[in-house]
Amino acid sequence: MAFLAASHPLFLMISESVNIIIITLAIFLGIIGIIGCVLPVIPGPPISWVGMLILYIWGHGTNSSGEPMSTRLLIIWCVITAVVTVLDYLVPSYLTKKSGGSVYASRGALAGLLIGLLFFGPLGIVLGPMLGAFLCEIIFARKSAGESIVPALGAFAGFLCGTGLKLIASGMMMYYIFVYIR
């Protein structure tokens, strides 16, 4: 009595089912990663990178020429993911401070993003950080409305830069997920 050989029809059927699950999971993680670039509670680029990692680990990472995904590509995208994730935390606060904002503007931008997303959807994601920074500068830093506009715009620019970097990174990783699906 022998175990299933690799050429046995049942083995091939199970193998094909696993392939479909792995590929679906990688694509799903890539999509969640892109969504996570805009939603502050989901770490977008790391989730996209895990999608690439899954293809690599299970050996499904081959492009249309039959070349496998290289370890080098995976490491490069791991480093890019780490850098983009760190920059996403540093850039908004840096631009807020460079524009004369206080720590309240940075916190207000994050609070505005969360509240804006919750109550106003996509428009809240865009306008929430700016409005949150503006209001927190007025209320907590006790600045005038005129003095609060520039830091609010700085917080908004920081949010856009961080989100843009994450979208580019996750979008490129999604591209590689599709390239390396065989």
Give the residues covered by each predicted segment:
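Short, strongly hydrophobic alpha-helical membrane anchors
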Residues: M1-I21
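Transmembrane alpha-helix interface/packing and boundary motifs in multi-pass membrane proteins
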Residues: G30-W49, L113-G124
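Interfacial segments of multi-pass membrane proteins
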Residues: S48-G66, A111-L117, L131-F140
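C-terminal binding/interaction regions
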Residues: A141-R182
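Helix-adjacent hinge/juxtasegments
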Residues: S70-G116
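Juxtamembrane interface at the ends
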Residues: P92-K98, P129-K143
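Short hydrophobic alpha-helical membrane-embedded segments
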Residues: N19-L29, S99-A111, E147-A152
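Alpha-helical transmembrane segments of multi-pass membrane proteins
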Residues: L29, G33, I80-Y89, L117, ...
